[in-house]
UniProtKB/Swiss-Prot annotation:
Reported effect, R37Q: In pmm-2; 86% reduction of catalytic activity. In pmm-12/dgr1; 92% reduction of catalytic activity resulting in lethality when grown at restrictive temperature
Catalytically driven reaction(s): alpha-D-mannose 1-phosphate = D-mannose 6-phosphate
Disrupted gene: phenotype observed: The thermosensitive lethality of pmm-12 results from glycosylation defects rather than ascorbic acid depletion.
Naturally occurring in which organism (per UniProt): Arabidopsis thaliana
EC class (word): isomerase
Taxon lineage: Eukaryota, Viridiplantae, Streptophyta, Embryophyta, Tracheophyta
Domain of life: Eukaryota
Name of this chain's protein: Phosphomannomutase
Protein encoded by which gene: PMM
Cofactor dependency: Mg(2+)
Pathway: Nucleotide-sugar biosynthesis; GDP-alpha-D-mannose biosynthesis; alpha-D-mannose 1-phosphate from D-fructose 6-phosphate: step 2/2
Note from the entry: Overexpression of PMM increases total leaf ascorbate content.
Any Pfam family: PMM
Length: 246
């Protein structure tokens, strides 16, 4: 077998890049990733926590990729072993966190949208995930909200309000997926994981939300990466084949 290309890593977003949003990766995609790993070092970076990424990419995800970064790299694994962890609670403190959560819940309570379900705020290790409709809606309701949001700008308006109200906390608000947005301290976006990849001369990042405000934007635009904007898992495979396997 040919040796891996030295000094090069292919780093992937999850939703919309390796999988359809919140869906499991297809067997074909997983087979391709195994083949690609023989050619280059591979890593995955997702905004979700490790349990959600495992649901999508498999329970052995921390071993299937050379690097696995959940919560934008605030929880980091290399070769299946933990190499770093950062906490929002320690960073902000409970008082500021409570102020932010209370305001957000009041805002959602006053929001007039067609349907609401449950789990409007999910507290993760390194971020808050906020969903105006509630995370435990059905897939059909997700699709419906995404269409509604594109017309009514529910998430962008909410983000603008929170950004202004909590400017003193120096937070980033990042819209991702179909129904939610993430809230985390500035610099805790996906570029956070790059500190673990300084030995690589080429970091190829693949993501779908690479526009300003999207949760792949900062890492896609970073001078430390070579950014590739993709539209689907099939597009990711095609771009990787052209880059690394042709």
């Amino acid at each position: 077998m040919a040796a891996k290309i030295p000094g090069v890593i292919a780093l992937f977003d999850v939703d919309g890049t390796l999988t359809a949003p919140r869906k499991e990766a297809t067997p074909e995609l997983l087979d391709f990733i195994r083949e690609l790993r023989k050619v280059v070092t591979i890593g995955v970076v997702g905004g979700s926590d490790l349990s959600k990424i495992s649901e999508q990419l498999g329970k052995t995800v921390t071993n299937d990729y050379d690097y696995c970064f959940s919560e934008n790299g605030l929880v980091a694994h290399k070769d299946g072993k933990s190499i770093g962890i950062q906490s929002l609670k320690l960073h902000l403190g409970d008082d500021k966190l409570k102020e932010l959560i209370n305001f957000t819940l009041h805002y959602i309570a006053d929001l007039d949208i067609p349907i609401k379900r449950g789990t409007f705020i999910e507290f993760r290790n390194g971020m808050l995930n906020v969903s105006p409709i509630g995370r435990n809606c059905s897939q059909e309701e997700r699709d419906e909200f995404e269409r509604y949001d594109k017309v009514q700008n529910i998430r962008p308006k909410m983000v603008a309000e929170l950004r202004e109200r909590f400017a003193h906390l120096n937070l980033t608000f990042s819209i991702g997926g179909q129904i939610s947005f993430d809230v985390f301290p500035k610099g805790w976006d996906k570029t956070y994981c790059l500190q673990y990849l300084e030995d690589f001369s080429e970091i190829h990042f693949f993501g779908d939300k690479t526009y300003e405000g999207g949760n792949d934007y900062e890492i896609y635009e970073s001078p430390k990466t070579i950014g590739h904007s993709v539209t689907s898992p099939d597009d990711t495979v095609a771009k990787c084949k052209a880059l690394f396997m042709s």
